[in-house]
Amino acid sequence: MPRVWDVPVHDSTRVRDVRVAAEQAAALAGLDEGRTATAALVATELATNLLKHAGGGRVLIDVVAPPVLAGGRDGARLVQVTAVDHGPGIADVPAALGDGFTTARSLGAGLGTCARLSDHFDLHSAPGRGTVVAARIGAVPDGPAAEPGPADRVRAGGVNLPFGGAQYSGDAWAWVRAGDLVTLMLADGLGHGPEAARASTTAVEALRDAAHVTPADALRRLDRALTGTRGAAVAVAQVDTRAGVLRFAGVGNIGARLCEGGTWRHLVSRPGIIGTHRPTTLREETADWADDRVLVLHSDGLPSRWTPTSETCSTTADPAVTAAVTLRDASSPARPVRDDTAVAVLAPVPADRP
C-alpha cells in the first residue's frame, strides 16, 4: 500500500518532518540522489513559506503518475508536494514567482525557485482565502518525448488526505491510458485504516489491466479483483479523445461532477460496494468531451455541502491544484474533514501549452 504524508505545519519543527517525508516519497518513486534533493528542497521551501507568510497550513506529499500519460507509458512516478493554507493569499502572483521575491505580508518566498526546479508547478491564490501550491518532481527523462496525439491533450491530477494523519489512506485515485482512451478512477475503501487502504490499492492495481475496456466492464473486473477485501465505492470515467466522448459508471458513494462550458452536471453512481455487493446492472452515462470540460471525482470525505465554483471549472489550472482548492474550500481549520478524502480531476491541456 502506498504511503500518503499529511504534515500540518504550525511550528518550525514540522519543516524537518516535511523534508523527511519528501525524501521518503522520493525513495518510493525511485528518484536518484539529485532529484531526491530537489524534492526535499521544494518541500522545505513550501513548508517554510506556510510558517512565515501564511500563519501555517499543511503539506500533502504523495507519489503520483504524470499529469499527461505520454504514449501510454504510465509507469513513471513523481513526488507531488502540495501546500495548502487559509492565509492572506498573494497580492501579485507573477511577482511572487520571480526568484528571490519575498514579503512578510503574503506568501511568496522561494516560489520562483520551486517552479524552476519542479517538473510541473502551479498555484492558485485568492486574497483573504489562501494559497494552494502543487509541485511535482520526477526522474530525469531518459529519452525523447513521444509524438503527441489526441490523448496527450487530456491531463489528470488529484490529492489524497488520510483521516487523522494516518500513514495510509483508504481512498485512492489513478488513471491509465490505452491508445486514445484515458481512464480516471477513484476508489474509497470501506471505512478507513489499513484494510480500507488495501481495498483501494487493489482497485488501482486492477485498473492497470482494464485501460482498454469500458467503465462498466472495468467495474466488473475490479469487483472480481476486490473479492476478499472490505470492498470499495468506485467510480470510473473514460474519455475517448479521438471521438470526443466521456463515459462514466460508478458504484457506491463517489461524487462526480462534470463542468460543461460553465454549467455543472451530476454523474450518478448506483448503490452498492465493489467487491462485496455489486449491482447486477451497471449503467453508463455518456457526455460530449471538449476543451471546456472539467470532471471532478471525490470520495464522501468531502462534506456534502460542497458545491463547485467557477474556479473549480478552470481549464487552465493544474488538475492537482483544482483538487486541492476543492478540498480546502470544502473544509476549514475549524471544520476538518472527518474521513479519508480524495479528489481527482480530469481536464484538457490548455491549447497554448505543448
Walk through the language-model features, giving the residues of each.
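Conserved subregion of the PPM/PP2C metallophosphatase catalytic domain
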Residues: 1-13, 20, 29, 74, ...
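Conserved beta-strand-loop-beta-strand hairpin that lines the nucleotide-binding pocket
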Residues: 1-5, 47-147, 178-184, 239-241, ...
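Conserved short strand/loop->alpha-helix "switch" segment adjacent to the catalytic nucleotide/phosphoryl-transfer site
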Residues: 16, 20-44, 103
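Histidine-centered phosphotransfer motif of kinases
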Residues: 39-54, 195
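Short amphipathic alpha-helical face segments that pack within enzyme cores
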Residues: 113, 198-202
